[in-house]
């Protein structure tokens, strides 16, 4: 087969293409991500979680070298969505129901019960990124909670 016999050559050609077309590729990736975020609630959930953990590691000048699912302590992203679904509650003022379609800026957020901002070490972040430290919370409640630990 041509591919097997020319692995290095193919790799070089692909690398050269990526170098020559960085902006075009980045634009395509951004369009894809934006569209998929809108149409796939589980994808949006995974990106949100990954970003929060990545930022937490950055805040203590560490690099995130652990897979997000391993940090969560789960096998699949579907397990996380089921965990959140089991905790969904109606909006206290409007009665709106939590769904994966209203997850985000104006709907509900992923709240860390013990805030990531309390982490001082890599071990702290690993503990705080575990799924048992997460809960769905309406955006305005989460924004007013900020980095506090609430009594139950």
Residue ranges and their predicted role:
Residues 89-90, 116, 144:
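Short, charged/polar surface micro-motifs in flexible loops or helix N-caps
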Residues 144-152:
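Short metal-binding segments enriched for Cys and/or His
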Residues 96-136, 147:
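Histidine-centered nuclease catalytic patch
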Residues 1-109:
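Contiguous alpha-helical segments
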């Amino acid at each position: 087969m041509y591919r097997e016999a020319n692995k290095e050559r193919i790799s070089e050609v692909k690398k050269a293409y990526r170098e020559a077309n960085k902006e075009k590729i980045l634009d395509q990736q951004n369009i894809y991500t934006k569209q998929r975020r809108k149409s796939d609630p589980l994808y949006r959930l995974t990106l949100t979680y990954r970003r929060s953990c990545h930022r937490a590691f950055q805040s203590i000048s560490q690099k995130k070298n652990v897979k997000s699912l391993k940090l969560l302590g789960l096998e699949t992203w579907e397990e996380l969505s089921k965990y959140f679904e089991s905790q969904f509650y109606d909006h206290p003022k409007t009665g709106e129901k939590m769904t994966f379609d209203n997850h985000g800026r104006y709907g509900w957020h992923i709240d860390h019960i013990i805030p990531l901002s309390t982490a001082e070490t890599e071990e702290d972040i690993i503990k705080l990124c575990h799924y048992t430290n997460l809960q769905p919370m309406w955006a305005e409640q989460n924004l007013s909670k900020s980095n506090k630990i609430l009594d139950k």
